[in-house]
Amino acid sequence: MKKTILITGVSRGLGRALTKEFIRLGHVVLGCGRSAKEIAALQKQFPAPNDFSIVDVAEDAQVAAWAKKVLATHAAPDLLLNNAALINRNAPLWKVPAQEFSNVIDVNLKGVANVIRHFVPAMIARGRGVIVNFSSGWGRSTDAEVAPYCATKWAIEGLTQALAQELSPGLAAVPLNPGIINTAMLQSCFAGGASNYPTAEEWAKTAVPFLLKLDASNNGEQLTV
């Protein structure tokens, strides 16, 4: 059955790989990202009914406008993937500039809340849907020089568990650790060691079937691909 999939952060990395794989399997993707160039390229490659918009999820007004536009022409998403995220430049916490710390919080945590705020009411009204908030191995453990990122991903775990307790029957919210994938984000931390892990495209072949199987019975579960 064809599903409507909402994905944030589709310009690159996991979001882009997921977009391509969902569409390849016949599903409709509603995606957003901050790169005008990449969003235009995706819309050209994957025309309607797929829809791609330039949105900074850290900006609540932009997310509100995006939701209004998307929900005017599409049903509430069957699957909402809060994927967009930033990582701080590797450094001890006391050397991370205040603005950089704020940027990580704004995208990784507030951005997730913004998307939930403007899309989940439509999912509740529809009576079904699954919200997947991307966590990380660093949302269940920690490491040096990524304290801001760890803080946001631990917060996502708690936020999602609380959200799961608030949802009406038929819906689910799950925090997802996608695993270790060779993306630009991982390369910024692991350097050459990132090549030992699967690419985003390889990962998506496993992740998409996994995500499509999620339903209300998974509500509140901590999951890992």
Stretches with model-predicted labels:
Residues I54-A65, A98:
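The beta1-alpha1 cofactor-binding region of Rossmann-like NAD(H)/NADP(H)-dependent oxidoreductases
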Residues P169-L171, P175-L176, T183, G192-V225:
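C-terminal helical subdomain
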Residues S136:
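Residue(s) in the substrate-gating loop at a strand-loop-helix junction
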Residues S11-R12:
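Conserved glycine-rich cofactor-binding loop
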Residues I116, T152:
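Active-site helix of classical SDR
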Residues L25-A41:
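Conserved glycine-rich Rossmann-like NAD(P)H-binding loop of the short-chain dehydrogenase/reductase
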Residues A91-L93, E100-S102:
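Substrate-binding pocket helix/loop in short-chain dehydrogenase/reductase
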